[in-house]
Amino acid sequence: MTKQAFVALVTCFNEDETINYEATRAQVRRQVAAGNNIMCAGTNGDFTALTHEEKVRLTEEVVDEVAGRARVIVNAGMPATYETLQLAEAFDRIGVDGIAVITPFFIACTQDGLIRHFSTVADAVETPIYLYDIPARTQNHIEPETARKLAAHGNIAGIKDSGGAQQTLEAYLQVAKEMPGFEVYSGPDHLVLWSLQNGAAGCISGLGNALPDVLAGILSAFNAGDIAEAERQQAIYADFRTDLYALGFAPAMVKRSLYLQDSSVGASRQPALLPDKEQDDRIVEILRLYRRL
């Protein structure tokens, strides 16, 4: 099976914090040209700062720009099942390839509550649903046994694991081996190649916003059986990640590194961190080191 890379696409903003849809379309074109698929309205896309209407329009714009040249997954997850369901139904009508559902945040959920939440959404739409686990941000974790139970649902197609723990990723991969049709997509940038070698269907990476060619290079080399080249590209990716993420919150650093390559990306909506000249100077040094400027 050909493995696939998705970029967790940034959302571009104007100076007045309205969405810059044309700049976002430009980022879509850049990623598709590199050979990557798109995930929009996720963690790297400032989804918590977007309104319902903005998420719907953003998805329409992305799908229109992609025009069938790549796959599009969009995140519908919100704290309440009700709002998640409304978004999922809207995305279902637009015609995306998959709907990711991040675990509810702020609200503490039991595993039974998570099963009910995801199943309710999956029952309501025809588009395949992908579970999205990122416990460091949501404080709710999809246990591997819960993933196994949900994998039996006919419209739950897989999981994006952004937990960062290799042990959990291994457990999800075991579920995929036992449940045909259930796919695992790795989120941690340093585990892209490892996850591919151990049965993942692909990855969904935020760092690919800054290094689209390197991300695509890992996947293309792996799919071609050139493991040495895949390892070389993964080493670049992992080193860039280490250098960049040492400066601050990962999605913010990705967005800022992209802004310093292309200012049309804009800053994130407040209360995101304001630009810091000293930090920018350090990011520029990293970008130059990796020949991005």
Protein language model features and the residues they cover:
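Glycine-rich phosphate-binding "P-loop"
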Residues: 133, 155, 269-270
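Catalytic alpha/beta core domains of metabolic enzymes, predominantly
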Residues: 124, 137-238, 245
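Short, amphipathic alpha-helical "lid/cap" segments that border enzyme active or binding sites
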Residues: 21, 25-28, 144, 277-287
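C-terminal alpha-helical cap/extension of soluble enzyme domains
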Residues: 4-12, 34-35, 90, 198-200, ...
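Alpha-helix C-cap/termination motif
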Residues: 34, 65-69, 94, 124, ...
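A general structural signal for well-ordered alpha-helical segments in protein cores
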Residues: 24, 55, 59, 84, ...
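Active-site beta->alpha loop and helix N-cap motifs at the rims of alpha/beta catalytic domains
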Residues: 2-141
